[in-house]
Amino acid sequence: MQGRLSVWLIKHGLVHRSLGFDYQGIETLQIKPEDWHSIAVILYVYGYNYLRSQCAYDVAPGGLLASVYHLTRIEYGIDQPEEVCIKVFAPRRNPRIPSVFWIWKSADFQERESYDMLGISYNNHPRLKRILMPESWIGWPLRKDYIAPNFYEIQDAH
């Protein structure tokens, strides 16, 4: 079953894949990395001007990485928000996804966290660098195939 946004995207010739609805009835769509930036701009113009959250996860050991965007559109009143979940999958070897920082400024720290924890590079992000881990940290701690070091260095806060 396709939701309203999926039908609208098909009507306008925009390539995507419907992933159905989540437990709250929010439509979930898959967008290819190469199509994501242009579709993100179109969604913003269409009224999805609020990026509620962005996160990322490792789909399976050795598999794809996913960047997830929760967008909100308020057309008929604050009590009737229209929400959509967008998933963009990237290959593990070279995970590159266009940054949406220039569309939704709230993506800044969220994309940086996804980079820091999973190693997803967000093309054209103005400050893509580690945000939680030290710059010298090797690896991506939230990947399912990450091997944690058997030591932990405690640094003085001063």
From Swiss-Prot:
Whether Chloroplast counts among this entry's keywords is: yes
Q: What is its main location?
A: plastid
The protein's superkingdom reads Eukaryota
List locations, semicolon-separated. Plastid, Chloroplast thylakoid membrane
Matching InterPro entries, A to Z?
Answer: NADH_DH_suC (IPR010218), NADH_quin_OxRdtase_su_C/D-like (IPR037232), NADH_UbQ_OxRdtase_30kDa_su (IPR001268), NADH_UbQ_OxRdtase_CS (IPR020396)
Q: List the GO biological process terms.
A: photosynthesis, light reaction
E.C. designation(s): 7.1.1.-
User: What GO annotations for molecular function exist for this entry?
Assistant: NADH dehydrogenase (ubiquinone) activity; quinone binding
What PROSITE patterns does the database record attribute to this sequence? COMPLEX1_30K (PS00542)
* Complexes and interactors: NDH is composed of at least 16 different subunits, 5 of which are encoded in the nucleus.
Q: Which NCBIfam families match?
A: PRK12494.1
HAMAP family named among the record's database cross-references: NDH1_NuoC
Q: Which family does it belong to?
A: Belongs to the complex I 30 kDa subunit family.
Q: Which PANTHER family does this chain map to? A: NADH DEHYDROGENASE [UBIQUINONE] IRON-SULFUR PROTEIN 3, MITOCHONDRIAL (PTHR10884:SF14), NADH DEHYDROGENASE UBIQUINONE IRON-SULFUR PROTEIN 3 (PTHR10884)
Q: What is this protein called?
A: NAD(P)H-quinone oxidoreductase subunit J, chloroplastic
Organism, as annotated:
Morus indica (Mulberry)
Which gene does this sequence derive from?
A: ndhJ
